[in-house]
Amino acid sequence: SPHARARIVRIDTTRARALTGVRAVVTGDELDVRVGLYIVDKYVLARGEVRHYGEAVAAVAADSLEIARRATDMIEVEYEPLPPVLHHMEALEEGAPLVHPKLGEYEYFKPAFTPRPGTNIANHTRLRKGDVDKGFAASEWVIEREYTNPSVQHVPMETHVAVVEWKSGDQV
């Protein structure tokens, strides 16, 4: 897809299927298969709507790579661009376009994930220990900062398991 988000209006594979050497052309409408490691939410090929730039909408099997490339160039796709969600904070706003409108219906790894249907929150975990307000009131210093990781990060900071104790002499 050349769009960050769009409705798929039409896919015409007629010319690609007619090309000599093409064995099969498949679109998302013909392949109702979802995949996902923790939340089974991604179609192998987009169905009805694309949710990110470059999302595949068709696949070609052919006698050679050259024929497959020619066939993909013959596939006609008509899109209706939709407003994309471009920032994670924007995605959390009320009324933001839903990346996954059927979030509550997906199969997911229940021991670890708690999706919030009707939002863009695929997992919400609430951890509370002790009285935070009391802890802040008793603290000599309270430092507030916002920390972020890149959107694709295989080693997140895991702040929910970090404990730090500051000792005299600037030691942690």
Show where each model-derived region lies.
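Structural alpha/beta core scaffold segments of enzyme domains
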Residues: 1-172
